[in-house]
Amino acid sequence: MLLNLNNNSVLIVAFVIVSLFFLIIVGFALNLAIAFSLHLKQNKNNKKYILNDQQIQLRLTEKQAQLTTLLNFYQQKIESVNREKSWLESQLQVIDKKDLKQAQKLTLHLKKDQILAQLNEKLIQKKVDQPLVNELQKTKLSYLERLVDQKIKLSENNFKSAFLKTKVKETAFNIFAAKNKVNWEYFKQVCDADCTLKNLEDEVEITFSNWSYLRRMQALLAFEKLISKIKTVKINELVINETLDEVKNEISQTAFQAGEKIVKEFQITNLNEQITRLIGLQKYYFGTDQLNLLELAVLTTKLVILLNKKFKLDLDLELLKAASLFNYLKWVDNNQFFQILNTKLNQLLISDQVIAIIQQQELSFYPDQYGMLINGVKTMIREHNTIDFEKLVFLNSTKLIDNFYLYDLNMIHAVEYNNCFYYFVSVKPFEIKSLAELDLFVVLLKTFLAKKQKQNPKAVKLFITTKILAI
C-alpha cells in the first residue's frame, strides 16, 4: 500500500516538472517570434525613409522632368493666348482697301429710279408674256420659301406661328365633307397645307399647318369660302378647285394693291405690274403689310438676274447692286438725313461676300450688313429724338464676328455716338431660344467687348435683330 502511494507521487511530480519545462520552451519560442517580428517591422520602416544617393538622384530627376513638362504646357498656353490676342488686335484694325475703293466709286443719286425705269422698259418691250410671268412667279416662290420655311416652333414671345386655326359647326362641316369625308380628303390633297381636325362639343376645329404663310392662308380662306357655299352649292371636286383658284386670284389682286402702296411710298413710278404684284406678295409670306426696303432691293436684283439669264436682257446689274445696297436711307428719315449720312456710308465696306450671295440668288435669311445698320440708326433716332450726324462714327467691326464664337453671329455693326458704342447684332433664332439665353448672350458679348476692345461695358448698347425674333 505504502509502495503504491510513493509511485503515484513520483508520477505526479514528474508530470508537473515536464509540464513546466514545456511551458518554458513555448514561452521562449513566442518571445523569439515577437522579437523577430518587431525586428522585421523596424527594418521595413527604416528602409522606407532611408534612401541611398543614387535613389535620391533618381527621384529628383523624375520630379524635375514632371515639372518641366507642366511648365512647357503652361508656357505654350500663354504663347497661344498672346498670339490670339495679337491676331485679334491686328484683325480689328484691318480695312480692306479694295472694298473701300469700290464703295467710294458708288454714287447714289437717281440710281434706284434709273434701274427700275430700265427694267420696266425692257419688260414692256417683251410684253411680259405668260412664260415670263410663270418663271418670275416660280423664282419668287422658290426664293421666299427658302426664307420663310424655317421650322420655327410656336411661341407666345414674338415667334411667328406656323399654323392657322378656324372653328365651324359640326353640322356645317359634315355637309361640306360629304359621305365618308370624300370632299374633305380631296381638299387636303389640293390645298397645299397639312390639315387636322379636332372635335369639340358641337364644333370642329381645323388647323392648317405649313411653314409658308401664303399656303396656310390660302387653305384657310378657301375652306371658309367653301363652308359659306354649302347652303347654295353642292360641294364637289370642281367647286373645290374653283374656290381655290378664286382665293388665289383674290390674293393676287390684294398683293397688287399692297405692292402699289409700297412702291408709292418709295416714290417708284411706272413699275411693271408683275413686279408690283410680286412685291406685294411679301405681305403673305412675312405676314406684314410693310415690305422692308432691303427685301425690295433683293427681289428686284433677283428679277434682273433672272431676266438677264433667261431672256438675254441687257440690264445693268452693277447699277442695281449700288441702288439696292445704299438707297434705303431715304426711308430712315428724309432727304436731308440721306445727304448728310451719305458721306459716312461711302466710308463703309461693301462686302464681296454679300454681292456674291446676291449674284448666286442665295441670299441669307437675315438682313445684310447695310440693312441692319440702317435699322440700327433708326433705333438710335427713336431713342435720341434728334441726332447730330457729324458725331456718328462707324466702326470697323466686321472682324468681330469671327472672334466672338460662343454664338453664331450672322453679322454685327458698330456705331459710336456721344461716347457710347451701339452694336447692331444679327443672330440665328435657333441660337437664342429664350430670354434667359438672350441675357446670357448680352453679358458674354459685353464682357468680350470690354476685354478685347477695351470698351466700358456700361457704355455699350446692344440691339439684337433677326427676321423671326426681334427683341
From Swiss-Prot:
Q: Which UniProt keywords apply?
A: Membrane, Transmembrane, Transmembrane helix
Q: Where in the cell is it found?
A: Membrane
Q: Which GO terms describe its cellular component?
A: membrane
Provide the membrane topology annotation: Single-pass membrane protein
Q: Which residue ranges traverse the bilayer?
A: 10-30
In terms of NCBIfam families, this protein maps to: MPN262
Give the protein's recorded name: Uncharacterized protein MG123
